[in-house]
Amino acid sequence: SGNVQKKIVSDWLKNKDGKDTIADKTDLKNVENVKGDETYTEGNQGNIEWKANGSDIYYQGTTDKELPVNVKVTYYLDGKEMSPEDMAGKSGQVKIRFEYENTAKHTVKINGKDTEMYTPFTMLTGMILPADKFTDVEVSDGSGKIVSDGNNEMILGVSFSGLKEDLENAKGKDKVNIDISDSFEITANVNDFSLAMTLTVGTSDVFSGIDVDSLDSIDDVEDTIDELVDA
């Protein structure tokens, strides 16, 4: 259903100079080293120091802070919204809708004016649907792709959360004619519904080099969107 049960954050401290210790600042709880036996000592105000011994440090911990993008998943059977638990074992036409809400809002100056902008995220959602249960599988136009190996339908959906709002805020709604979706849908006919794991990954790196305040960048955005959807 997309309800959050636990938030785990992973950090990678690169030790390119081979230092004996690495200082970091974190507000994570239950911090643990996930790729070595290096230890750390805690200081004040979230400061920690890792005994790196020349190595990179990979650690993770939990947080109760808001995620930069919230994911809502809604399930329908024959047009009626239903929980996946209630859908288990049933047959009919199924629709699964993923919605992405960007919460990473901040204020920046554009042409001397304070403007609310988002950190744009590329959201990739993937799942595998067994071909003996799911037929006539379709995905949202322009925002997904289906790959079949005969036994399974492999689904990949792409969404660009916060990007359209940034472009509209930077250039004006009348100058942005790109169809950028913040949702993704799958429809299919199903026999004996069951669903294995779905995976959603978000990254802000894809558009990190694009200046939304440049008209030329809009062409770059269109090209990048097309490349990701067609990949």
Predicted features and spans:
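Cytosol-facing boundaries of transmembrane alpha helices in integral membrane proteins
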Residues: S1-A231
